[in-house]
Amino acid sequence: MKTGLLLFFLFIITITINAQGVIIGDISVSGNNTTKESFIIRELAFNKGDTLSNTELNEAINNSKQNIVNTSLFNEVNISSNINGSIANISIDVKERWYLWPIPQLTIDERNFNTWLETGDLSRASAGVFLTHNNMRGRGEILKVLFMLGYNQKLGLSYEMPYLNKKKTFGMGFQSIYTLKHEVNAVTEKDKQVFLKTSDHPIQRDWTNAIQFNYRPKLYMHNTLQIRHHLWEFSDTLVDFNPYYSPKSTTELQYFSIYYKLKIDYRDYKPYPLNGFYTDIEALKTGLGILNNDVNIFSLKSTSRKYFNLSNNFYAAVGLIAKLSWGGFQPYVMERGLGYGRDYIRGYEYYVIDGQDYAVIKTNIKYAIIPKKVFKLNWIPTEKFNTIPISIYLNVFGDAGYVNNNQVYDASNKLPNKFQYSGGLGIDLSTYYDSVARIEWAVNAMGESRIYLHFIAPI
């Protein structure tokens, strides 16, 4: 009886201690030689003067650390509290990354690394320089400059300022990119891209300019609005080869588009999440009726991902992607079904599934063979490069999807309008400077089994 009473009183005391409030006092930041202190404080889940219980304080510190890590500006982030009476003073220590990267580029004009491995054709390579600065003026502003020559020629410039106002909720940016191609994906046959090449003149030119507005009223909510101008030029050879490539086989196309994206992001680590969730909604109106053209397409797309910590190094994830389109005919150059970017079914990397509407579900269960470990290379003098995190996961997955295509250009394409699915095993590596590498074995609904390489998180 006495033991029971003692445990009861200890339980009450514990609850009372955790419920007692502390007031956030001074907030200090160290290690930020480049990054402005105000940029770091913007990511905190608490403010000076807030009253929090001990439990709430610990949770807020953990969430704040994740937010700062997810800026991708720091190798390490540590947050500690010093409680003196009812006042909790907060100390934040960061170790900054290297921000300026003049990177030589050798790119292959393929949808993914696996499709290039199928042929190993280096004649489709382009070389150049990609210059990026991820923390201009110490405010998280991003400058990108691209200069490419070779198979495809490309010039690009973009600048993004995440915050312009005192509350750090409103930002702007712009981008401009010019591309000249001698070979393009002109049509799809047997569910694979068919390329058309011209040697004596460019087969396609395109120039896209955009202005962007960002609004972030809350820590985990992002709004993006873009107004874009597009100018395309197609060779006669291209539109003769595929009359559906552009609207009414035109050789010149110019139009405006408007794009909006709402994103809610509670992932613990964006490059390779293990806990939390992510969801977004995208709306794109192509053709605003301002210029004389025949483009009038509206699409809605949504992506949702949920990540779970099951127990003792076991994790699970599920992702759903869905897209709907309206507006009638979609020229081939604008039509995007599955097989592009992150919208694909594992096991179908060598295929594209054309269509106007689609849905994909992806599932994973993984085991941490090597949970996150951080190695210090002491022979490298700077902390910007001597901190190497490594984690390795065994991954079991299953995907399924469906593409609706009511614009059938070629009867040899059998994958649209049919349920597709796959499953497999993989090994994932998450490491240096947010890098991810995956090797997977997958079998699809056609019974094909292959090994694939990827360099982005599976879900």
Model-derived features with residue positions:
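Periplasmic polypeptide-binding modules associated with outer-membrane biogenesis and secretion
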Residues: 20-112, 130, 144-163, 298-304, ...
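Outer-membrane beta-barrel transmembrane domain signature
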Residues: 368-374, 380-423
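Gram-negative/organellar outer-membrane beta-barrel architecture
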Residues: 89, 94-259, 267, 337-343, ...
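Short glycine-rich beta-strand segments
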Residues: 177-181, 282-288, 323-327, 395-403
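Outer-envelope exported proteins of Gram-negative bacteria
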Residues: 94, 226, 317-321, 395-397
